[in-house]
């Protein structure tokens, strides 16, 4: 009697877990740009990037989804590009998808230093 094919194992990673791995990777590659400590209650700039990677983690597209500060946008884009290739998104997305897109938010403190929302702690309370 022929046996039924064994289904592929379910992906062990979630998008949130992958984003945390990517955020650590970006921070390790940009130590001079990281904002240490608690973020201020009123952030000078917030930049949201849409990031597309292939199966190997190569950046194929990066777009600014939201920003009101051109300088912060340039720092976010340069920091991400300097971090490439990113870790590969193993087991995420449709089975035969060649590309995966996700977003990350850069939270800027003073002097264009940032934290990534995926890993950022709480902000200081307002006055």
Walk through the language-model features, giving the residues of each.
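Short, small/polar residue-rich loop motifs at catalytic or cofactor-binding pockets
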Residues: 41-48
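A short acidic/small-residue loop/turn micro-motif
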Residues: 66-72
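Conserved acidic
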Residues: 10, 14, 68
